[in-house]
Every structure is written in C-alpha cells, then in structure tokens.
C-alpha cells in the first residue's frame, strides 16, 4: 500500500475540487453533429444558469397554480437546489469525446473523463470516484451521475420522438415530446437513483456473481422535471382491474442482444403507476437541462424509491396489460435469488420466473465515505487534540425516511448515533425520495485502538442492515455493514499514522481489504509445499509477491506468467498441454488477463489454475496498467488533470494488424444476409488498405465484446484470404434464442454480431491456435514440423471455416499438389455453409473432393449421405491411413469424440499423431 506525506489528503480537511478544475459555460454534453443538439424547451419554467424564469404556456402555468397549495415543501427547496446545481456545474471540468469511445457507436457522446468504467470500452457502465461524488453533496452533476447502459445509446431527435400508450386503455395514443411538454402539468423534485448492483464488488470478492464490479458510488441524485405517469394514463382512459388492467409495461428504444434480440423493458403494478403518492413520472429534464444521451434523452421513466433497473431510458412505449412484462430483461435481470442458487440451477429450475424474487423497492443502505480509501491520518500532537469527523451517505426505498445511522468501532459491541442531514423535505404524502448524509465526531485516540469502523442505518419501518454479507447470483442489493479497516503505517521517517482501507475499489481496480484478505485466505487454503518449474526457482506460494513490472518480463515460451484476480500463475509447464495450444497462453503472458480468463473458461478450468499459482501481485495506491482505463483515484494524488486532453502515443504503422497481447479495434463496414441465420460480416482493419490481418493459415482470432455487462470472447476463423488488404470477413451462423432446445438462449456472440450496426466496432485478438499450414503440404503443430501429401478434412457445422481456410490457401498456390478430401456434416442442406464456394472449387480442381453428410434431407434428389459420419462413409471418401496422410478435424466435441476419432481408428489412423483437431 502506497503512503505519502507531502501530497496526502485528509478526509474532513481535503481541499475542494474546484481548485483543479475550471469553470465552463453550461450546455449539453455532445458534439456539434450530435442528434440531440439544438433541442430547446420553450416552456421551461427556470433557466438555472441565469437564475431567471422562462416563458411558459398559460395552460401549464394554470395547472401548476392548481398544485401550489400542495407543493409548498417542494417549492421551499427550489432555490436551494438551483444554487447547488449551478455551483456543481461551475466546479466541473468539461466533458470530452473520450478516446476510449473511439470506434464504438457511442463515439458522438461527450463524457466526463474521471468516470470509472466498469465494463471496458463499451457499453458505457460507470460510476464516479466516490470522493468526487461526495464533494458535490446532495445534487450530483449530470456528467458525474452513474450510468447503466446495456448497449448502444440510441441517437434521438426531439422533433421525431413519440411515446406510445397502448394496450388496455380506451384511447390509445402517441404523444410527441412537445405534447408531453405543453399539455400536462409538471413540477420538479429531487430523487436519488441507485443501481441494484451498488456495492456488488464486495459480493464478487466472496464469490463471483454474474454481474460486473460496481463499487459504492452506483448512486446519484438529480432534480427531475416530469409528466406524472398517472395523468398520462388517465388521459388515455386506462381500464379497470376488472377489465384486466393489472400491469403497466415500459419499453425503451435500444436494440439489445439479450434473449436473441430485444428492447429493454420491464413493468410495475397498475396500483403503483396510478398512485399519486409515488411521484412516478416521465422525465424530460435533469438538473434544469434536457436529458443527456446516457440518461435517456429525450424521455425516460423515473420511479422514486425503486431500483434504477425499473426506470426505462429512451422510453418509446407504455403498454397496459394483464400479465407482467415478458421482456427478457424483466426476468433475467434485477432478481435476488437464494444463496444456494447458481446459474445452472437458476436456468434448470426456472428460478428467474418466480415472482417473489423480483426487486422493486430499494433496501436500507449506508456507506462510509470519509475517511477515503487509503487516506492517511498522521498521529501527532496537533491531530490528537481535535476530533476526526466520520462521514457518509444513507438511503432507503419506497419513500421511507432514514431515521438513524450508527457507527461501531468495536465490531458491534457498542454503537454511536450519528448526526443526520436530510436536505429534502417530504412530499405531501410524507415520502422521502433522496439520500441523506450522516456524520460523527470521534476521538483520534479511539481510532488508534479500533481495528475497523462499521456503519449501519435504520429506516422508519425499523429495518436495518445485516451484519454479514448475503451472497446471491446476481450480486444485487448488497447492504451488509459497510466496514473500513484501519492499520498503522509509517508514512514518513519519524512519523506514524493510521491508514484506512475500504472493502473494494470499483471495476477491475485492485485494492481494498477484501481483496487483500481474499488473497491471504486462498494462500492459507492452498497447498503450502514448495513448487518448482522450468522458469522459476523454489518458492513458497503463500509468501511470494511480485510487481507488475516483474510479471511483464515473463512473456515467452521459456517463462509464461499471467495474473488472474490478483494472483500470479506460472503456466510454463502447461503450455504443451493447453487444449487450445500454447498461443492461448502466450498471447496473455506477462499481463493481467482476468477479464479474458473469466470470459472463456469454465469453473473446472479455474480450479485447475490453482496448481500453477506462485504468488500474489503487489498492489499500491496508484493505478496499474491493468486499470489504465480508470482514473487515479488514490487519495494520495491531489492533482486532477482530467480536464486536459489525454496525451496518447501515436499508433505505430505496421503491415499486419494482429499483434500478440494486444486487442485491435475493427469497424464493421458491411453485413450481408446469406440466409435466415447466416451472415457475412466484413470488418475494416485499423491500418487501412495497406494493412493485412496477419493471421497464419490454420489459426484463429478471438472476437471480444461486452454483452450484458460481461466480457464475451469467442474464437472465429476468417473466411477471407490471408492476403486480403484492409479488411477481413467472417461467415457466422446466428444461433437465435428459442430455436435449439439444448440452448434456449441461443448463441451470445452470434446474436451480438447480428445486432451490430454498420459503423460500430469490436475488438479482435490473435493469432491463436496450435496448427499452422505453411504451404505445400507442410504444417507446424505445437511448434513441430509435419508433412502430408493427402489430407482427410472432416468438418461439422461452423467447423468448416478453418478447413475452408486451408483449402483456400492450397488452391491459391498452383505448385501446391496436396490432395484434399473434405467430408462435411450438417443437420440439413440449408445448414451447409460456403457450399457454393466448395462446389465451385471442387469442379475446377482435381485436388479437391467434397462430400456432404446431413442428418435429414429435406429435398428430393439429395445425392450425398444421410445420417451421421460413419466408418463406411469415411472409407469411401477419404484416403487410407499412411505416413504421408493427415486428418484435420473441426466440429462439435461429440462429433469428434463419437464419430471422427473411433472411425478413423477403425481405418488404422494413428489418431494421437495423425489427427489434428483445430
């Protein structure tokens, strides 16, 4: 843990952030060509930037006047909230077109560079640094408001946008934005939004959930201008319960991959939707400005006291129904399942569809924000003579008021009651929609004897927070006591101090006492015997630690180390045994590959990895390379230069795009449908027309994308020739949801690719694979040369692509006399990929023979085999076993295990040496 003296900050004494930022003119956060630019609000009541009323229609003013009697408490706070908004904006650096959004469909959106990105480049899921969030206090500036996006932000225009109300209503209608603005009463009020995953990383440190790593800043408060939902539904004549109107569903505009392709949607009960006490609204302004693109421009739902997942952004449809929403995200998101339910059990036993596990209202929660993580409190004559002020926030759900916050410094033996600050007043129904703040002065000498500080809150129903964390599959609603650990340190020669440690740091940032204790726990449970490998001396796995720079040196076949979840592994002796070949390890050697490892490995593989652990990564208070996408939020770094344009190294021009250990961004430039479920995707290379992909024949690439907040990586073999310049092509079979009984949700990556818009970008990594065809019958297999005059090439389904690549390379060389015998199995004729190309090549070249096998023929006159690959089929259509004959195979594991391997053995093939499986 890093310690500093000269530039350290002290929680209650820390300087305001305005010292390192500049004032700027308030305005929308987007560039000149943004589709939301130029939208104005002719009937807005208040210009917050100039603190003066704006023109408003008589109709709206009259409607507002009718509410004056009941809105005193809100109006009393209006000037105070306005001042907070203006002050917060003036202290905030301008948002920028972040280089991390280059090559994505969100590249037009300006964002605050200090936001901590939780899911890589795209989609944009982020939270502000906790200390910045708390600096602004009650009202969060829009650029620092947490963001939860499932996919691409829709490009919307105010003039074209409509919201449809349909279903069980007497008068279905579509409302333009101007109608929503001019024809309905409005009032502004503050509401706190919280992601149900707030504090999830604490759960992930105990056991990995299926969600990404939210820290404790997935919470923000804004002032929202609104159209009451109940008014809109009354205008449309919502039907009664007796006539079946039981639920109100909301649907957004974004196209998402979940469930095989869908919009984001959810629902609430009709009684809630029509309850005026709930203040459920269609919001079109946030903190006195139009909604930002990331927050739902031009209109979104706000349901105070509920989790953020119910507040649909980019709202397009409101449907009154009898049943609750049947949207994929309504069922497969925002659930708290029992702790024993893992992903397999949840799917097998349909836990997702049990209504008792849905999350609506927030639970009671509280967090310690001062002291900051890794803050150092020096112990000297001056600091011990004055109290130290602990601070934090708290919130509850359903409009319930937080009534008490308590702090313990002796593990719950005794509790001290904190001072509460409630900046909001209740609405006329007694509801509280916002967070509050707590503080407690403690003696520094008491901190010296405390091992930890913990906080818990109570609301008006006397609910409080549990002492211990309760894990659940989605990692949601974590509200156990928030604990900050204390340790003694020597920040400078002759000084001692107390260093404070929060449980975790958000995203993939390392740090936090849970991270440290997890490492120690695993070390204790691991085999304590000494281990030795080719590349490392004897070492004790429980005590060895390494810096990132040390690990970086081990990036070769002679010594291949990787970092996963803060542990260091020496994988050198596993290189020859890895099913995907040594490239699969070497491509990440010397790096932190946590996300990629988790994306493509099973639980079994993760357990196997423990055999290769040699120590732990040393973490400091400063950002490492593995967290370079996040700002340096250490409390020891007082300077903030996030308002400056980042200095980036110019990319080195190179003839080939692929480079080991690097992900390269490639833009989708065309998408062609070959059939109802087969697509050809063409991706441009970053180096333009003078650059080749650089993929050796026989090897593959990883396609990387963030889907539903998690990194997804899949191996693909391009079908374009290796000498194509400026682009590569993939032929992909899209596995849609609900088609294959064994895979009801379909293929994650293939559906994601199908949903991509032309112009959007994904990452590519490679080359990978243990087989390389070097030409004229020569192969390199696991680094050793092999030769064949004849090739038996056996493929199943999409496994044709590496076979196709080798065939293509051989036929391109007129001096390559290698003979090829392809047997290609599929379910039906319609499933055969690249058939036209294969048939054309076979007619023109005597070196190539192609035979098809289908499980069932759906057309008359089928002249090839029906059924499965059998010994007889192979004897008729591939060469006999010989020293100069190799078999190449790629397809489903069952085909390789039960059809290819045993039947080749019956033909006397040496399958250990002469069968090469891609």
From Swiss-Prot:
Native species: Cucurbita maxima (Pumpkin)
For this chain, one GO molecular function annotation is:
nitrate reductase (NADPH) activity
Its quaternary organisation is: Homodimer.
Q: Where is the Cytochrome b5 heme-binding domain?
A: 543-618
Q: What is this protein called?
A: Nitrate reductase [NADH]
Reactions catalysed, semicolon-separated, are:
nitrite + NAD(+) + H2O = nitrate + NADH + H(+)
> What is its induction behaviour?
By nitrate.
Name the domain of life: Eukaryota
* EC number of the protein: 1.7.1.1
Q: Which Pfam families match?
A: Cyt-b5, FAD_binding_6, Mo-co_dimer, NAD_binding_1, Oxidored_molyb
The record lists FAD as bound by 714-717, 731-736, 743, 748-750, 801
The entry's free-text remark on the cofactor is: Binds 1 FAD per subunit. Binds 1 heme group per subunit.
């Amino acid at each position: 843990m890093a310690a500093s003296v000269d530039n350290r900050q002290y929680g209650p004494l820390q300087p305001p952030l305005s010292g390192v930022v500049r004032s700027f003119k308030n305005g929308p956060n987007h560039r000149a060509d943004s589709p939301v630019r130029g939208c104005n609000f002719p009937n807005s009541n208040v210009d917050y930037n100039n603190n003066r009323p704006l023109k408003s229609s008589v109709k709206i003013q009259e409607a507002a006047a009718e509410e004056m009697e009941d809105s005193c408490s809100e109006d009393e706070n209006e000037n105070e909230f306005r001042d907070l908004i203006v002050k917060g904006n003036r202290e905030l650096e301008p948002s920028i077109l972040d280089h991390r959004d280059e090559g994505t469909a969100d590249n037009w959106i300006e964002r605050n560079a200090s936001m901590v990105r939780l899911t890589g480049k795209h989609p944009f899921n982020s939270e502000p640094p906790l200390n910045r969030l708390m600096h602004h206090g009650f009202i969060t500036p829009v650029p620092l408001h947490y963001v939860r996006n499932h996919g691409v932000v829709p490009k919307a225009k105010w003039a074209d946008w409509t919201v449809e109300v349909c279903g069980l209503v007497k008068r279905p209608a579509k409302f333009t934005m101007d109608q929503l603005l001019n024809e309905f009463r409005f009032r502004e009020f503050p509401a706190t939004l919280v992601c149900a995953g707030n504090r999830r990383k604490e759960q992930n440190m105990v056991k990995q959930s299926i969600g990404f790593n939210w820290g404790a800043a997935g919470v923000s408060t804004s002032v929202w201008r609104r159209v009451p939902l109940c008014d809109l539904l009354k205008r449309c004549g919502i039907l009664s319960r007796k006539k079946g109107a039981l639920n109100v569903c909301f649907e957004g505009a974004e196209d998402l991959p979940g469930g095989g392709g869908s919009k984001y949607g959810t629902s609430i009960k009709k009684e809630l939707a029509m309850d005026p006490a709930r203040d459920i609204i269609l919001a079109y302004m946030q903190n006195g400005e139009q909604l930002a693109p990331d927050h739902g421009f031009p209109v979104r739902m706000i349901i105070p006291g509920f989790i953020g997942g119910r507040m649909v952004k980019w709202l397009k449809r409101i449907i009154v129904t009898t049943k609750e929403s049947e949207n994929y995200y309504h069922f497969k998101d925002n659930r708290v399942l029992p702790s024993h339910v893992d992903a397999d059990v949840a799917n097998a036993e349909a836990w997702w569809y049990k209504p008792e596990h849905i999350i609506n209202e927030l639970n009671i929660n509280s967090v310690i924000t001062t002291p900051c993580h890794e803050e150092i409190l020096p112990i000297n004559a001056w600091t011990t003579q004055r109290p130290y002020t602990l601070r934090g926030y708290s919130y509850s759900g359903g409009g319930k008021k937080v009534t008490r916050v308590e702090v313990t410094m002796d593990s719950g033996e005794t509790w001290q009651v904190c001072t509460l600050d409630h900046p909001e007043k209740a609405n006329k129904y007694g509801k509280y929609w916002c967070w509050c703040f707590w503080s407690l002065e403690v003696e520094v000498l008491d901190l010296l004897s405390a091992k930890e500080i913990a906080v818990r809150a109570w609301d008006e129903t006397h609910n409080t927070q549990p002492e211990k964390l309760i894990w659940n599959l989605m990692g949601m609603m974590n509200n156990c006591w928030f604990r900050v650990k204390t340790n003694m340190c020597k920040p400078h020669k002759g000084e001692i101090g107390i260093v404070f440690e929060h449980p975790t740091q958000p995203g993939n940032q390392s740090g936090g006492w849970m991270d440290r204790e997890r490492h120690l726990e695993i070390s204790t449970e691991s085999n304590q015997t000494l281990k030795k490998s080719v590349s490392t001396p004897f070492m004790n796995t429980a005590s060895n630690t390494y810096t990132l720079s040390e690990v970086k040196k081990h990036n070769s076949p002679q010594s291949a180390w990787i970092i996963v979840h803060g542990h260091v592994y020496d994988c050198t002796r596993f290189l020859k045994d890895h099913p995907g070949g040594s490239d699969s390890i070497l491509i990440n050697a010397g790096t932190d590959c946590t996300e990629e490892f988790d994306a493509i490995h099973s639980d079994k593989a993760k357990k196997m990895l423990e055999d290769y652990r040699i120590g732990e990564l040393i973490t400091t208070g400063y950002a490492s390379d593995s967290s370079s996408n996040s700002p340096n939020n250490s409390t020891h770094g007082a300077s903030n230069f996030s308002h400056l344009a980042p200095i980036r190294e110019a990319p080195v021009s190179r003839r080939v795009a692929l480079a080991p250990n690097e992900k390269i961004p490639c833009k989708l430039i065309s998408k062609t449908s070959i059939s109802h479920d087969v697509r050809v995707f063409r991706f441009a290379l970053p180096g333009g027309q003078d650059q080749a992909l650089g993929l050796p024949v026989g090897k593959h690439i990883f396609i990387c994308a963030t889907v539903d907040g998690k990194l997804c990586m899949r191996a693909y073999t391009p079908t374009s020739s290796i000498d194509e310049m400026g682009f590569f092509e993939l032929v992909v079979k899209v596995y849609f949801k609900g088609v294959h009984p064994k895979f009801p949700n379909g293929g994650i990556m293939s559906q994601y690719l199908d949903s991509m818009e032309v112009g959007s970008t994904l990452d590519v990594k490679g080359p990978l694979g243990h087989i390389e065809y070097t030409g004229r019958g020569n192969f390199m297999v696991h680094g050793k040369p092999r030769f064949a005059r004849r090739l038996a090439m056996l493929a199943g389904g999409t496994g044709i692509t590496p076979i196709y690549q080798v065939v293509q390379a051989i036929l391109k060389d007129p001096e390559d006399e290698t003979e090829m015998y392809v047997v290609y199995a599929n379910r039906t004729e319609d499933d055969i990929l690249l058939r036209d190309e294969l048939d054309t090549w076979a007619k023109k070249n005597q070196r190539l023979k192609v035979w098809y096998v289908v499980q069932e023929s759906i057309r008359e006159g089928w002249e090839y085999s029906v059924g499965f690959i059998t010994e007889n089929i192979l004897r008729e259509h591939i060469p006999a076993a010989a020293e100069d004959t190799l078999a190449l195979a790629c397809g489903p594991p069952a085909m390789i295990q039960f059809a290819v391997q045993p039947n080749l053995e019956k033909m006397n093939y040496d399958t250990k040496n002469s069968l090469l499986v891609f």
